[in-house]
């Protein structure tokens, strides 16, 4: 019997493609192709994701354990070697399986737009309720974590229920039989567990007001912000430092702050804006082409990140310990935002959009 031949790659080096990262599709470039254990993998570069402002952590032996812990809190999806972690390098490049890559053609570009629209609608609905999207949730109360499955409506125990998972293979097979094979990976992603960050009650009204001011009253948050995201994160780090933390804890806070900043810069343009804000965003990119958005936008958009960041983290391999540690840091920062909400959030930071802007936003 002849040996089984290696699979033939569908994509070539240098080819422009679309790649799943979390629930959305992003424009990317296939940099390298590799075949290992009869599986094709591609080294993907996401267009526009490499930021000049990326933070490189200090290398310190005494805080190595903390550093590794923090890297575990902000992981990239499966298949990416740790050397390409966004906290360790200025790159978001990663190795991905072939199932995550689609041809750059009109049909897949349409799917990209549909996924983006669905995410924005879900985001807006969540803001209307003053909380993160999602109706059916169950809690790991001791970890302050909420999870849900998109396919299984029943409540899920903290350690998982073997009986429920045995029923899941059938629906994806049926769906894959009816759709283009290149979309198969979406089903895999939609089956993942969603991690939810709890927004403090004091901040929920600001999410609703922010939504109302922009989508109903057609106002815009004044940019550049009087107090930008970089400044808010720096103030938080200094606040924690003033409370006499140990070197390791101080270092951990710095790394978490750097991670939040990176996620904000990557997610803003695709997941943190309402449709009415897009012309304003285009103007900002034209006027400040080299500036990270964390130097331009302020507290309202930073708060929106915490409604969405759980969805991104859901597509990464987090164990229970790392998840609890991550949420501890994120919730502590949210408490800081709530404590300082009077100075960080104000309706006076918005302005009515002029008539010419409305024509652009149509």
UniProtKB/Swiss-Prot annotation:
The modification N6-acetyllysine is found at residue 143. Residues 188-342 are annotated as: Sufficient for interaction with PHF12. A motif (Nuclear localization signal) lies at residues 135-146. Residues 133-266 are annotated as: Sufficient for interaction with SIN3A. Residues 12-51 form the Tudor-knot domain. Component of the NuA4 histone acetyltransferase (HAT) complex which is involved in transcriptional activation of select genes principally by acetylation of nucleosomal histones H4 and H2A. This modification may both alter nucleosome - DNA interactions and promote interaction of the modified histones with other proteins which positively regulate transcription. This is Mortality factor 4-like protein 1.
């Amino acid at each position: 019997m002849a040996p089984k031949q290696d699979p033939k790659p569908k994509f070539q080096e240098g080819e422009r493609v679309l790649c799943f990262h979390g629930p959305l599709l992003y424009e990317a470039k296939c940099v390298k192709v590799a075949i290992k254990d009869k599986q094709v993998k591609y080294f993907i570069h996401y267009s526009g994701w490499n930021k000049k402002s990326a933070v490189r952590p200090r290398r310190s032996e005494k805080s190595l354990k903390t550093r590794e812990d923090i890297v575990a809190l902000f992981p990239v999806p499966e298949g990416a070697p740790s050397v390409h972690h966004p906290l360790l390098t200025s790159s978001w490049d990663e190795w991905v399986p072939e199932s995550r890559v689609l041809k750059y053609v009109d049909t897949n570009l349409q799917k990209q737009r549909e996924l983006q629209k669905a995410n924005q609608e879900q985001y807006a609905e969540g803001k209307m309720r003053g909380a993160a999207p999602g109706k059916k949730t169950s809690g790991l109360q001791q970890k302050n974590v909420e999870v849900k499955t998109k396919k299984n409506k029943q409540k899920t125990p903290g350690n998982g229920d073997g009986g429920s998972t045995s029923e899941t293979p059938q629906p994806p097979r049926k769906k894959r039989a009816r759709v283009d094979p290149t979309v198969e990976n979406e089903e895999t992603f939609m089956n993942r567990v969603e991690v939810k960050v709890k927004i403090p009650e004091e901040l929920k009204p600001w999410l609703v007001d922010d939504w109302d001011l922009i989508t109903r009253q057609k106002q815009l948050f004044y940019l550049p912000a009087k107090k930008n995201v970089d400044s808010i994160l720096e103030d938080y780090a200094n606040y924690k430092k003033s409370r006499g933390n140990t070197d390791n804890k101080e270092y951990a806070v710095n790394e978490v702050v750097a991670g939040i900043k990176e996620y904000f810069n990557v997610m803003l343009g695709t997941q943190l804006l309402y449709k009415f804000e897009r012309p304003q965003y285009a103007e900002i990119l034209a006027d400040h082409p080299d500036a990270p958005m964390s130097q331009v936008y302020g507290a309202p958009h930073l708060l929106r990140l915490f409604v969405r960041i759980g969805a991104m983290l859901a597509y990464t391999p987090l164990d229970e310990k790392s998840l609890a540690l991550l949420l501890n840091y994120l919730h502590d920062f949210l408490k800081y935002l709530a404590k300082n909400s009077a100075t960080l959030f104000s309706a006076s930071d918005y302005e009515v959009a002029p008539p010419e802007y409305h024509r652009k936003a149509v």
